[in-house]
Design a protein with these regions (language model features):
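Structural signature of nuclease core domains in nucleic-acid processing machines
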Residues: 1-222
Length: 222
C-alpha cells in the first residue's frame, strides 16, 4: 500500500472548515486530493490511500526575537510557523511514516498531531479516519456535480450566504452589477448552519447510505 499527501498553497493562513466543505464553499483541497488519488496508479504500483491534505501558507515570516537566538532555535521557530494544517489520517502507523521524529509524549513540529505517553494520539479536529476521507471526497464530488447540473440547466441565479457579508456580489463594489436584492423573490440567501466536525461527518455518512439504499432499490425494481 502507498500513502499520499497533498499540499494546497495559500497566500493566507487556512485551516480546514468542515462546515464549508459540506456546503461546497471549500472544495479546492479535497479536489486536489481526489485527483491525486485517481491518478496515483500512473506513478505508483499498488493501492494508494490518503494520509493527509494540508494548507501551506506561502509567506516570508517575521520572527520576533526577544533574546539571543541560536541557529537551531531560529530553525525550530520557522518550522513551527510553517506547521501544516488540514486533514490527517488517524492512524499511528501512518503518522510514524510521515513524521518519524515524534515519540510518545511529544507533539509533531511539522503537523498538528501529538502522541500521548500511552502511544495513542491526542484529540485533534485534523485527525479523521479513512472512511471520513472517502466520505468527504464523495460529498465534494456530489457538490461539483450539483453545481454543474445547475449551470447546464440554466440555473444561474445568485445564491449568496448571508453569514458571508464579504461576498463581493452582495455587499461589495460589484453589487451595482449583480443587482442582488433580497426583497425580490428570485434573490434569496442560502442557509448556512454552522456544523461541528462530528455533525458534518455524520450527515455525509447518512446521505451516502441513503443514496446507496435508493440505488439498490432501483436496481431490484429493474
Amino acid at each position: 500500500e502507498n500513502y499520499l499527501t497533498i499540499l494546497d498553497y495559500k497566500s493566507s493562513a487556512h485551516s480546514f472548515n468542515f462546515s464549508d466543505a459540506y456546503y461546497g464553499l471549500a472544495m479546492q483541497m479535497i479536489t486536489y486530493l481526489d485527483v491525486a488519488l485517481l491518478n496515483a496508479d500512473k506513478l505508483l504500483a499498488g493501492k494508494t490511500l490518503p494520509a493527509g491534505a494540508f494548507y501551506l501558507h506561502v509567506k516570508n515570516p517575521f520572527i520576533k526575537q526577544n533574546s539571543f537566538m541560536t541557529l537551531e532555535d531560529y530553525q525550530k521557530t520557522i518550522i513551527t510557523d510553517y506547521k501544516l494544517k488540514g486533514l490527517l489520517l488517524n492512524d499511528t502507523a501512518v503518522l510514524d511514516l510521515i513524521d518519524p521524529a515524534v515519540e510518545s509524549g511529544q507533539a509533531s513540529e511539522i503537523f498538528t498531531f501529538k502522541k500521548l505517553k500511552a502511544g495513542n494520539l491526542g484529540k485533534n479536529d485534523d485527525l479523521i479516519t479513512l472512511d471520513d476521507f472517502n466520505h468527504l471526497i464523495a460529498k465534494n464530488r456530489a457538490n461539483m456535480v450539483e453545481a454543474g447540473e445547475k449551470i447546464l440547466s440554466g440555473d444561474l441565479k445568485l445564491d449568496p450566504i448571508k453569514e458571508r457579508p464579504y461576498t463581493p456580489t452582495v455587499s461589495g463594489p460589484y453589487r451595482a452589477i449583480s443587482q442582488f436584492d433580497n426583497t425580490l423573490p428570485e434573490n434569496r440567501y442560502r442557509k448556512y448552519i454552522k456544523l461541528s466536525k462530528e455533525d458534518v461527518l455524520s450527515k455525509i455518512k447518512e446521505e451516502i447510505e441513503g443514496h446507496n439504499q435508493e440505488s439498490n432499490e432501483e436496481g431490484e425494481e429493474q
